[in-house]
Amino acid sequence: MDVSKISPGKDLPNDINVVIEIPQGSQVKYEVDKDSGALVVDRFLFTPMAYPAAYGFIPGTLAADGDPADALVLTPAAVVPGSVIRARPIGMLKMEDESGQDEKIICVPHDKVHPQFSNVHSVDDLPEITKKAITHFFERYKDLEPNKWVKVTGWADKAEAGKVIMEALAAAK
């Protein structure tokens, strides 16, 4: 897969594309190799936990950690790794890890992809248990890995997520 040929979206930062690397429910961390475009197994999670949502990145972006901007997409079904999904950002999980700042843009499928989340416009519209599950996963998923750690510092609104997306787009140019 040549990620450089995938558009970051139709109406940035409100209508974006997310390349899915990890399906919801996976205990395997996959990554798209920057050089070959192949989907490779980065590692198996050391903790007995599974990703709470589809996980991937926004193509054409460069986040503060030197990788494309990370995104989670809440979906009604598992999405195959390597798929590109049209999504709407609704907020952001703010975190730090052993490598520094590491935000996760929280998204839902665009209404044209599936209407289940058509009334969700902010992370505040999500059930509290969904936010708690996402927070819990990211606070704990590296617990058993040597020299790795994560600190969740809070949630941000759609406007702040949009600012981070636009900064990551500018950084990639």
From Swiss-Prot:
<dbReference type="GO" id="GO:0000287">
    <property type="term" value="F:magnesium ion binding"/>
</dbReference>
<feature type="binding site">
    <location>
        <position position="102"/>
    </location>
    <ligand>
        <name>Mg(2+) 1</name>
    </ligand>
</feature>
<comment type="subunit">
    <text>Homohexamer.</text>
</comment>
<comment type="similarity">
    <text>Belongs to the PPase family.</text>
</comment>
<comment type="function">
    <text>Catalyzes the hydrolysis of inorganic pyrophosphate (PPi) forming two phosphate ions.</text>
</comment>
<feature type="binding site">
    <location>
        <position position="70"/>
    </location>
    <ligand>
        <name>Mg(2+) 2</name>
    </ligand>
</feature>
<keyword id="KW-0460">Magnesium</keyword>
<protein>
    <recommendedName>
        <fullName>Inorganic pyrophosphatase</fullName>
        <ecNumber>3.6.1.1</ecNumber>
    </recommendedName>
</protein>
<feature type="binding site">
    <location>
        <position position="141"/>
    </location>
    <ligand>
        <name>substrate</name>
    </ligand>
</feature>
<dbReference type="GO" id="GO:0006796">
    <property type="term" value="P:phosphate-containing compound metabolic process"/>
</dbReference>
<dbReference type="InterPro" id="IPR036649">
    <property type="entry name" value="Pyrophosphatase_sf"/>
</dbReference>
<feature type="binding site">
    <location>
        <position position="65"/>
    </location>
    <ligand>
        <name>Mg(2+) 1</name>
    </ligand>
</feature>
<feature type="binding site">
    <location>
        <position position="43"/>
    </location>
    <ligand>
        <name>substrate</name>
    </ligand>
</feature>
<keyword id="KW-0963">Cytoplasm</keyword>
<keyword id="KW-0479">Metal-binding</keyword>
<dbReference type="GO" id="GO:0004427">
    <property type="term" value="F:inorganic diphosphate phosphatase activity"/>
</dbReference>
<dbReference type="Pfam" id="PF00719">
    <property type="entry name" value="Pyrophosphatase"/>
</dbReference>
<dbReference type="InterPro" id="IPR008162">
    <property type="entry name" value="Pyrophosphatase"/>
</dbReference>
<feature type="binding site">
    <location>
        <position position="70"/>
    </location>
    <ligand>
        <name>Mg(2+) 1</name>
    </ligand>
</feature>
<dbReference type="GO" id="GO:0005737">
    <property type="term" value="C:cytoplasm"/>
</dbReference>
<feature type="binding site">
    <location>
        <position position="55"/>
    </location>
    <ligand>
        <name>substrate</name>
    </ligand>
</feature>
<feature type="binding site">
    <location>
        <position position="29"/>
    </location>
    <ligand>
        <name>substrate</name>
    </ligand>
</feature>
<keyword id="KW-0378">Hydrolase</keyword>
